[in-house]
Amino acid sequence: MAAKEERWRELAEVKRELAERDWFPATSGNLSIKVSDGPLTFLVTASGKDKRKETDEDFLLIDEYGKPAETGHSLKPSAETLLHTYLYQKTDAGCCLHVHTVNNNVISELYGDEKQITFQGQEMIKALGLWEENASVTVPIIDNPAHIPALAENFAHHAAAGSGAVLIRNHGITAWGRTAFEAKRVLEAYEFLFSCHLKLLSLRPQLVK
């Protein structure tokens, strides 16, 4: 239980920081953090909660099958818990953050037909662990089917490393890392890149594509 309580505090702190940025409009978004590997368990945000508020029912423990691991409560896990389950099954990720922002939604629509967007030469790319000069990073953009298992299967194809990110078209970004700190850093880096790119497009509209 000590591990669960420690992970709870970590995830609550991340949720607090992201909520302060207004990255959870209309109860959107979901967060998780791994508690154990054998068997796999992780905490995930409860469905339908206002993530700007802090309560004792913000998260619930999930098992390796994506189901609640504890009884005695009526909480429902986030509708997209299956994506988190696949991520922890396939990689050594320890934390996963999914947020809906205007910037990531606009980027996903602008480049959705291309299925990806690439950034190059930005200093912020170093936050993703890419230190070579003029480094580039590509973010895949997947479709957003209403059927969650189909979305999770598509997402799983791109979840192959301990840290990374995937854009879901007109839906949001899912970013992850081996720790809560790394996951938040990855998320912040991509949101910066999205914001910078859109600002450049607004100043130089001829460079839209």
From Swiss-Prot:
Catalyzes the dehydration of methylthioribulose-1-phosphate (MTRu-1-P) into 2,3-diketo-5-methylthiopentyl-1-phosphate (DK-MTP-1-P). Binds 1 zinc ion per subunit. Pathway: Amino-acid biosynthesis; L-methionine biosynthesis via salvage pathway; L-methionine from S-methyl-5-thio-alpha-D-ribose 1-phosphate: step 2/6. This is Methylthioribulose-1-phosphate dehydratase. InterPro entries: Aldolase_II/adducin_N (IPR001303), Aldolase_II/adducin_N_sf (IPR036409), MethylthioRu-1-P_deHdtase_MtnB (IPR017714). Belongs to the aldolase class II family. MtnB subfamily. Pfam families: Aldolase_II. Its cofactor is Zn(2+). Keywords: Amino-acid biosynthesis, Lyase, Metal-binding, Methionine biosynthesis, Zinc. SUPFAM superfamilies: AraD/HMP-PK domain-like (SSF53639). GO terms for biological process: L-methionine salvage from methylthioadenosine. Zn(2+) binds at H98, H100. One of its GO terms (molecular function) is methylthioribulose 1-phosphate dehydratase activity. GO terms for cellular component: cytoplasm. Homotetramer. It comes from Bacillus velezensis (strain DSM 23117 / BGSC 10A6 / LMG 26770 / FZB42) (Bacillus amyloliquefaciens subsp. plantarum). NCBIfam families: PRK06754.1 (NF005244), salvage_mtnB (TIGR03328). It catalyses: 5-(methylsulfanyl)-D-ribulose 1-phosphate = 5-methylsulfanyl-2,3-dioxopentyl phosphate + H2O. Its EC number is 4.2.1.109. The gene is mtnB.
